[in-house]
Amino acid sequence: MGVKDLSKVIGDHSPNSIRLKEFKGYFGRKVAVDASMCLYQFLIAVRQDGSQLQTESGETTSHLLGMFYRTIRMIDNGIKPVYVFDGKPPQMKTSELEKRTERRTEAEKQRNDAVELGDETSVNKFEKRLVKVTKEQSEEAKRLVTLMGIPVLDAPCEAEAQCAALAKAGKVFATVSEDMDALTFGSPILLRQMIASEAKKLPVKEMNLNQVLKDFGMNMGQFVDLCILLGCDYVSTIRGIGPKKAFELIKKYECIENVLETINQTKYPIPQDWQYKEARRLFLEPDVMNCENLELVWKEPDVEGIVQFLCVEKSFNEDRVRGSLTRMQKGRQAAQQARIDSFFSVSKVVTSETTKRKNEEKNNLKKRGPSLGKKAKK
């Protein structure tokens, strides 16, 4: 879920923090990608006939197709991704995960009813609600991107939190995810719609956390408390408090403790055993690996390894795969050349400026006339 209605609240109160940019505008940038979110999106992006891509034996390959082509698109545009996968979910997320399981069970019943009625549109809708990324699919995705030479990290806990930690440490420019809680975890920049299909021609939606805090008139602690009131994966919401009310309460009372002391708890009943302090701690002190000494290395793709995996094992079209890998390698070379050209152009500018300064100094000396240490000729 991320944080309920946070995108709307930011749109209402901090429109300047949102920029729509072209994909190619991130040339030369390193980004941390919430891989688990990507896989989910690839799996729900079913074909027009409502089915997922599969091998002849019935194995789903939508996740591999999506990961392969989205990665190539990024590399082709000079973007260097790091894929971060979810680790063990925090204990406080158990309730949310149980709710998701219940929703999938209900969706399965509704899907079966729709099948009996021959309602194809409803069948497709409920099929998407049944999607869950399996451990095997995650491992296959890791294998693929590793063969492609892309760094892979297994987060101790939440992938978005680890992405945010990488961004805060300056290892990457931004977090790539559709989950808004990447901002709540402190990612300075969040990029949404970056992994959308190229055919959709959607701009990348860039969100700037510092601008959000400035426009909201809040510090990070207050922003986290706002996100908890809006609704997150760790605790229930307070019935009757929607996005507008939540924003007003934090603006006025600054923290959840003050809100609870002030509001009418008959009108706004507090959930039993509401562990908002623990939720706050999970956002402000998430379980992440230390990024300070972490070295991210992008390697040459293992072309034959990729062909073996995708074409031999997963029945992908070899000509298309090899053609795409050629495009990827050209993209890598272009990015490297651009960085070299950039280096020399900067050096040229510096040299030019130095020469210009020396010439100006010579001209100034001529204008001043003879130096003080010499006698002027009569």
Swiss-Prot record:
Amino-acid positions noted as binding DNA in the UniProt annotation, renumbered to this chain: R47, R70, E158, G231, D233
Keywords: DNA damage, DNA repair, DNA replication, Endonuclease, Exonuclease, Hydrolase, Magnesium, Metal-binding, Mitochondrion, Nuclease, Nucleus, Phosphoprotein
Segments for region (I-domain): 122-253
A GO cellular component annotation in the UniProt record: nucleoplasm
Molecular function via GO: 5'-3' exonuclease activity; 5'-flap endonuclease activity; DNA binding; magnesium ion binding; manganese ion binding; RNA-DNA hybrid ribonuclease activity
Keyword Transmembrane helix among record annotations: no
GO biological process: apoptotic DNA fragmentation; base-excision repair; DNA replication, removal of RNA primer
Cystine residue pairs: none
Compositionally biased intervals (Basic and acidic residues): 95-113, 354-364
Cofactor remark from the record: Binds 2 magnesium ions per subunit. They probably participate in the reaction catalyzed by the enzyme. May bind an additional third magnesium ion after substrate binding.
E.C. number: 3.1.-.-
Region N-domain, annotated ranges: 1-104
Pfam family, any one: XPG_I
Bias kind Basic residues: ranges: 365-378
Superkingdom assignment: Eukaryota
Entry binding sites for Mg(2+) 1: D34, D86, E158, E160
Region: Interaction with PCNA, residue numbers: 336-344
Compartment list: Nucleus, Nucleolus; Nucleus, Nucleoplasm; Mitochondrion
Annotated region described as Disordered, given as residue ranges: 90-113, 348-378
Mod. after translation: Phosphorylated. Phosphorylation upon DNA damage induces relocalization to the nuclear plasma.
Cofactor(s) the protein needs: Mg(2+)
Matching Gene3D superfamilies: 5' to 3' exonuclease, C-terminal subdomain, 5'-nuclease
Similarity remark: Belongs to the XPG/RAD2 endonuclease family. FEN1 subfamily.
UniProt subunit comment: Interacts with PCNA. Three molecules of FEN1 bind to one PCNA trimer with each molecule binding to one PCNA monomer. PCNA stimulates the nuclease activity without altering cleavage specificity.
PANTHER family on file: FLAP ENDONUCLEASE 1, FLAP ENDONUCLEASE FAMILY MEMBER
Protein name per the record: Flap endonuclease 1
The encoding gene: FEN1
